[in-house]
Design a protein with these regions (language model features):
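Conserved short loop/turn motifs at secondary-structure junctions
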Residues: 22-26
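Conserved phosphate-binding/catalytic region of the ribokinase-like
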Residues: 5-9, 13-17, 21, 31-64, ...
Length: 177
């Protein structure tokens, strides 16, 4: 009954973006995610964030979202891959998740963003953004949430993955202070 109520509310709302994130407390799982994705407002930008640092979950359950924002640990768990270096690891998840944008969070090493390549030879299918957190990190809790929120808003406003990645990284860095 709760799932029906929640998906009905979601389908009746008007939103430019919908972020699916519940810190893996049970709302989003393999059985419910398809219902939530189907209920998202037409043309809304959908974002999946599994938040499984302390619980088991699989970011691939959000396959089909427009953007995913996992950390390295979540990607390695989803793919069962503890050995690959970051670029091939992210490329594999990007392909399997069928998302438009994958922002792979790397903690103090920054972030690598994967996107569809264009025919323009100057546009890569991936790029990295260094961490903008200062050396005096006081509280990293919430940095991923700040990145998620600001990157989503910027992507919806600009349609530019590079700008969204940079603004999200700035927000994450500020959250650490």
């Amino acid at each position: 009954e709760t799932l029906v109520d929640m998906t009905t509310q979601l389908s009746n709302c008007h939103a430019d973006a919908v972020i699916f994130s519940d810190f893996r407390h049970g709302i989003f799982n393999k059985a419910t995610i398809p219902s939530f994705l189907a209920a998202a407002p037409r043309n809304a930008f959908t974002v999946g964030d599994s938040q499984v640092a302390s619980r088991w979950g699989n970011i691939l359950e959000f396959a089909g979202c427009d953007m995913l924002t996992p950390n390295e640990e979540e990607v390695r768990f989803a793919l069962g891959d503890q050995d690959s270096v970051i670029r091939p690891l992210g490329s594999t998840l990007y392909d399997q998740a069928r998302c438009k944008i994958l922002m792979l969070k790397l903690g103090d090493r920054g972030m690598m963003t994967f996107r569809a390549p264009l025919e323009d030879a100057d546009r890569r299918s991936f790029f990295s953004v260094d961490s903008l957190a200062r050396e005096n990190i006081l509280d990293p809790v919430g940095a991923g949430d700040a990145l998620l929120a600001y990157a989503t808003l910027t992507q919806v406003a600009t349609g530019n993955e590079a700008v969204a990645s940079i603004i999200g990284t700035v927000a994450a860095g500020l959250e650490c202070e």
